[in-house]
Amino acid sequence: MARRSIRTLVLGLASAAAFLFPAASARLAGESAPRTQASAQAPSVVAIRNATLITVSNGTINNGTIVLRDGKIAAIGANVQVPAGATVIDGTGKFVTPGLIDAHSHIGNDAINEGATAVSSMTDMGQVLNPTAIAIQRDLAGGLTTANILHGSANPIGGGSVTIKLRWGVEKGDDLIFEGSMPGIKFALGENPKRQGGGAGGLQGNQSNARYPGTRQGVEYVIRDAFTRAKKYQKDWAAYNAASDKATRIPPRRDLQMDALVEVLEGKRLVHCHSYRADEILMMIRLADEMGFKVATFQHVLEGYKVAKEIAAHGAGASTFSDWWGYKIEAEDAIPGNAGLMTHKGVNVSINSDSAEHARRLNTEAAKSVRWGDITDDQAIGLVTINPAKQLRIDDRVGSLDVGKDADVVIWNNHPLSTFAIVEQTYIDGKVYYDREEDMKRTAEATSSTSDSQPAVTGNLFDIAPEAGKVVFNVNGPTWAITNARIHTVSGPVIPRGTVVIRGNTIQAVGANVSVPSGARVVDARGGNVYPGFIDAQTDLGLNEPGVRNFDDVSEILTFNQMLRTRVAYQSDSDAIAVARTEGITSAGIFPGGGIIGGEVPLMNLDGWTWEENVVRAAAGQAFSFPGGGGGGRGGGGFGGRAGGAGAANSGLRELETLLAQAKVYGQNPNRDMNWSLEPFLPILNKQQAFYISAGNDNAITQAIAWAQRQNVNIVIRTSPMTAVSSAAALKAANVPVIISTVLTLPQGGDNVFHAATYQAPAELEKAGVTFAFSSGGFETVRLIPFQAAMSVAWGLSKERALQAMTLDAAKIFGADKLVGSIEAGKIANLVVTNGDAMEIRSRVLHVVIAGKDVPLQNKQTELFNRYMGRQ
């Protein structure tokens, strides 16, 4: 019944003539209308000419032609004749690849978990497919054509999986299914099926609600017991079917749970096993060997690099994340070189998404393994094409550009492993299911009446407060130089071939004709690039540690925490700090949470023996969650506000206003006794510091700006990219800068919003003249700041402004632009040296300089990579 009602709703939506564009989001709207099977039709013959064809199976063909006929690849090569009557597409400057394949997806599902039982093999994801789910269209826009739709990980043995093609808008869920593909089944190991207190297994709040198992050994037993029963069930049916008197016998009881497991034993159903730790991966290999079946893929497999030899020997594939880590205790030893290391050890590896958002950019997720896994470009593209095709046993149909295979192809405007690559068209079975030009035409129509661009705020946003003087410029330390580099000063023009001289912790000189002092150590950059150190404008790095140490000092319990010196809790030896700084992040705004006022916001360097040595600016202001501002607390998806209705919000503001009024009186008394509840507000009232206001919607931003004007204080807004855009006029008019949460997230506002709205948001802010900075929000993704900038450039932001947003503009937002943010004589020597464009994922960081120190490019993850690469 539920399925029919959902289908009815879906078909009603699909019959609409077009999506409507909300006026408040006109700039970011422009989504295409839902496609029906008819609207996705293409001419029977299509020829793409003069393109770079990345075949995957037979190398790369420059200036080649590929012909699509009747849903298949009919011809491909450098000298292919275009058939008469074919629709010809000029591929000059374009790249063509096979459609991307995601071996772990949950898009287009009405539900993913059946958690009531430890074995739910009787369920099947093919029964709950929604062909008009907007996630399908958004992932098509990223070049995805095939996905393995998996059950969730609530059970040691979960439900059946199904492989689909992303034929968005077909009438029935069954029309998505990849014809002839093998069915699968989801297994799950580790914390998900056993976790206690709100998870799938273990104790569910109290003993009476416990669901077995609650341990890893319990998970192993559930699977072992199920297959023991399945083998007996298989034997009973075999005996019955072979009996000469079968017609008079009573058949064995039909068991839908066992039917699926017998298919596994007979090699008719693929096992896809959710896993994290090396011990549980090895356990599953040994158990599968004992029971007589093969694991098709280990999913997630974050510690697969530790047992790569065993995975390869078993013949299993490994489908992993590119660089996810630290988000749960099982992910503490995850490394971004996992896919590369397993590839080197002979495992068939794919990169998956497990996320409708990550599936939009599987191409650049694969490119990360070039940077961190030491694999080639061809191997990286294989991670999202032929390798998952082999894992799903569909490589005879898709995964490479070969004659006779399905015409699932993608046209890109740049090399698909480039951070700046965008999909132009996506074909499935020779039909166009996504066309960027159509989407951009609609976007242009929606934005035709918008205002002209405005210049951004320039100069210092805030005076530097007295405590910033704790940063000591030391020119008595070692002198060394970086030479033969392309120097991106940010504050001035690029120096094509220049030198930076560093003395102590300070930049002594920079220019094209700078002399290196006698005796100085010289680093020859050999044509590399030198940038100011990158700044993450909001994170809890150093306050929140992943893994077994698992300290969390982000949020205090009071409503007003202005007396808290956040810097004193900064754990300078955090594993997460080293992970971030080796990728060029040299400084970060460290934000506490909790209450209305969370505490002081320091700007900290990412290297130093102690927190004192890490300080750039001890306190740039106070973290302020605007009452009633909405949002969602810690993390990269959005900035939170205080819970409660309008009454609670007004009460909170009134209480803060009372504190500020008291602080004004307090500050006028030269003989005052110290009051730590009022003292921290004095530099804010003197406009030496700012309130960093978290506001989750347009109304909250409008109210926050008006409130700040009444109080005569400086503010910085912290909000999502799309909310910043919809409030851009107000931000510009008040000269209020904004820290945006990650752009690498799904657009807000429902299905009608343009699929790339978050990627485009920084360009819209640039056009509106709003000063902004990028942020991660959490410790796990700090290293991705340059790639947020790159995605924004791909969708319209100028490269100059992108670089500013993660250097000088970020420094201005913290009132620290006289200290960091650009390469100028007299500033702190925070620098990054790369062998290519810093925003390109495949570029490598060669040197990171923090306060004049050439910091070793080592962290826990590089150490694990090197250690296990040496395992024989």
Question: Which residues fall in each region the model found?
Answer:
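Bacterial N-terminal signal peptides
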Residues: 10-23
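N-terminal pre-domain segments of enzymes
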Residues: 28-43, 444-476
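Histidine-rich, glycine-flanked metal-binding segment
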Residues: 32-38, 53, 57-97, 491-531
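C-terminal cap of metal-dependent C-N hydrolases
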Residues: 51, 402-445, 485, 824-868
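Divalent metal-coordination and catalytic microenvironments
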Residues: 51, 66, 71, 93, ...
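His/Asp/Glu-enriched, well-ordered alpha-helical/loop segment
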Residues: 112, 118-123, 270, 309-312, ...
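Polyanionic/metal-chelating signatures
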Residues: 140-295, 299, 416-418, 422-423, ...
